[in-house]
Amino acid sequence: MSKKLIIAEKPSVANDIARALGGFTRHGDYYERDDYVLSSAIGHLLELVAPEKYEVKRGKWSFANLPVIPPQFDLRPIERSEDRLKVLQKLMKRKDVTAFVNACDAGREGELIFRYIVQHSKLNKPVERLWLQSMTQNAIRDGFASLRADKTMLPLADAAICRSESDWLIGINGTRAMTAFNSKEGGFYKTTVGRVQTPTLTILVEREERIRKFKARDYWEVHALFSVAAGEYTGRWFDESHGKLGKSDDEHARAERLWNEASATALQSRCVGKPGVVEEESKPTTQSSPQLYDLTTLQREANSRFGFSARNTLGLAQALYEKHKVLTYPRTDARCLPEDYLATVGETLEMLSDLNTCGGAYSSLAKAVIKNKWVKPNKRIFNNEKISDHFAIIPTLQAPKNLSEPEQKLYDLVVKRFLAVFYPPAEFLVTTRITRIDGEPFKSEGKVMKEPGWLSVYGREAGTEDGNILVAVTDGKAVTESIEVKAFQTRPPARFSEATLLSAMEGAGKLVDDEELREAMSEKGLGTPATRAAVIEGLLQEDYIHRNGRELQPTPKAFSLMFALRHFGITELASPELTGDWEYKLKQMEQGKLPRAEFMNHITELTQDMVSRIKTGEIPDTAFQTLSTPCPKCQGVVQENYRRFQCQSCDFAVWKVMGSREYGHEEVEELIRNGVVGPLQGFRSRLGRPFAAMVRLSKEFKAEFDFGQGNDDENAEPVDFTGQEALGSCPKCQSAVYEHELSYTCEKAIGPGRSCDFRTGRIILQRQIERDQVKKLLETGKTDLLHRFISKKGRPFSAFLVRGADGKIGFEFAPRAEKSRKGKASTETKETEIAGDNGLKAVSVSAPAAAKKAAKDTKTLKPIEPAATLKTAKTASKKVPKKVASNRPAKKPT
């Protein structure tokens, strides 16, 4: 009897199909019944390669062998999944298998996986297509009752194959051409490029360029403290005309900012001591829950909440899906569920309401949804039009057991979002109060939750403040207690974290000017939810970016690539427009409006043009600077070029990048002039760990690291501190302490005849310690509160440096700041919020609670018992007033 072979994309789908259709017997990696054989791939099983005669070894990545544009491609099994491919090939070649059913995912990539498997088999058997939008058993049975003819799927297959081949052509040729260019002077400098990778890198580099060019600007705010019968509240002056004449060209302009101190102090003088006239408006508002998770939003949330990388989140979600079977398919870009999924949602809620599920953690929350019948048709949740290959990530009917801590955290995120989406909106009462002093407006805002709605899933209760609570004003009048002028500085744009970079990749279509191309990218962005984590990891592995805590910072290699691409005029490779153009044309192809050959001809021309520009490209010396300091070896002229600072008369050269750090021009000038520079921060070890070092020119005029250990040798030359200013007395032996190389050190602690060991770093945990702070430390035993220490785990913290009784230097942490008095509305919370949203630069007076732990990361210092537990980061910022004027009467002695 003839049978059809069903090929699913992954084993879990094969299991679902077997259960839905019934009657199958399992035989290892496949199922069988009278009319069907059923098995699956494990994602992609094959990858594109050029035919052998077109392929070259890595050492032959020269321009002579480029471009590589084969007339057709071969397929190569992916090593890790080759065994599964052999299983499928054996089943496909069975004589009783007379046709295939493509049950891979309903989309471009699912089509590609199946087409490559069939192409590799070299078999020509009839094909039918199972097209599913839902994995319920009824949906699967309905799908098999209406299988699609293969000819209707050919346009989608063409688009899938074109996407794969064009990515190969651009990526392989671009990478080999840029590698050949960067290796012209010898060596092998692999320089990867790609359709998604390079525009993503451009986003990071352009942000870093903005940060480097940024110049802080001073501005001032005027704050007032008012009192009424019920208590006190604060207000901030604002310009009522701001924004009424259109959007300002100044990106830092805000209604509350004054750009010269004189205006601020004049405003203060006009208002001090005068009464306030109060007007206010209170109105109810609602806030709906966020939509269900797709992979990108889950990765963003997990990165923001727990610091999980995009790759780690994907791995955890995949384990929860495949191993534990407690989440639905995670590699999705949909945030809705199928319209026929209401019954399944009800069953899932019943599972979550069980007290045995996660110790009853979700029981009361799930029961509330069931009791109130909140699951009902709602296009925001159940919408077939918003589903592509897969639906949103939600819990399955399987109760979790034996989850690891990270797995439990991610599962909890998904479950709570799933529950919250069915709850009613949260309800708030928002009050906006304007207090006018001599006509000048001061704004105060308050927000109180009336009904928590979906926020009750996250532990919020009615009556709690959500921002500031404003005390009541009964007669429309307020006493002005004080007026403060506060000074701030604008801050540069924040570097991307994985969470914000994922958002930028998802919304990259907004960067495209062409309307049709922007529309083509509107749903996809750069990459797909399943590939974005790999793109970020690829940039890390290729040394294009580094992780600094949660920040992603482009390396000199990234800037070098962008500089070259811009110089060669290959701007399309570095912008999202290439992806937009491809998506637009591939969608036309899916609709049968664009022939495959026409698209590939365009890609071939693009590839040839790209290689030609790189091959013939030259970066003239006029694009770089000539140093003013002569060559230390021959006194010749030292000229900067693409990779080095090179003497024009001899072989002396300093590489522009050392230890993953690029020299500044002033640093190279100092190195050549003095033979030493530093200490410099920002170097990285081969393990990616940051370090600081001096850099010296050796006797052979080679730049080398110097970690300041040369004077520890008993046979070393004595150090002459004549002419240097002593910073204070050594806490151990009372000798003089001087600045020396990487340390502040006792004069008796270096050179021959050492009798003391006092030494403390000039740079501690990536923070430079200023001379005046060392003087204060030696004199008083304690520095000022110092900010911007960075632990080895990337945690920023603030601390005092203190001198212990034994002379050793350690950390002491700031006392916990008192909470504001109840009934007094404070602008502190609001200002901290502005610090995140509007670039405010506030002075922090405390540090994260993790600072004590973070301080232990250093070997330079040992922590001293902290003076107090620390305040959390979110409430740490306080502003230092520039000037204070008050008409508050002095208190009488009691």
Predicted regions located by residue number:
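C-terminal helical "lid" subdomain and adjoining coupling/linker elements of P-loop NTPases
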Residues: 185-188, 192, 204-259, 305
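Glycine-centered, phosphate/nucleic-acid-interacting loop/turn motifs that mediate DNA/RNA or nucleotide
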Residues: 324-325, 543
